[in-house]
Amino acid sequence: MKRGLLLLLLYFSFLSAFAQQMDGELYNLAKTKSGYRSKRISSYDKSGYNGDRIVGIKPNEKVIICNIQGAGIINHIWFTIAPPPHLISRNDIILRIYWDENDYPSVESPIGPFFGQGWDESYNFSSYALTTGPANGTGMSTYFMMPFGKGARIEIENQADNVIDNIFFYVDYYEVDKLPKDMGRF
């Protein structure tokens, strides 16, 4: 009897030892963060119709995707582009990201390699901070944290010889009262 009680006590001790920690990542998802507001800028059609895209970016044309004022942290960017990669090279579409009202970009890269699709190829893959899919990697996402103190601007330049028919995008970010201490720049 004593042995059975001891085994039962040990069993419940092990259960509590291996239970989910109350300070883990899933627990922290449910916590509100004072001074943080979740925001999104996207290509949605403000008229309510289904024209959720930027249409017809001509060769050598630049388009501003977003211009955010104040402090914040971009936590997700998603793009999909038409025509597909075999008709317009993702190496000829340049992504530029500017921080804090700078005249020069901190990020300047062909959009394909920025999202992990080098060698002028498109394919599905998933990593911690980058993912592409579902159809031959045409949807491209990044989850890199990109803090900024005074503002952020993202632009696309078409350096291809043909028109970019459509660009669809999301830029998700936290608007913050003040950046956390010791935040660098991407």
Region spans (language model):
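Bacterial Sec-dependent N-terminal signal peptides
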Residues: M1-Q21
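Beta-strand-centric surfaces of beta-sandwich/beta-rich domains
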Residues: Q20-F186
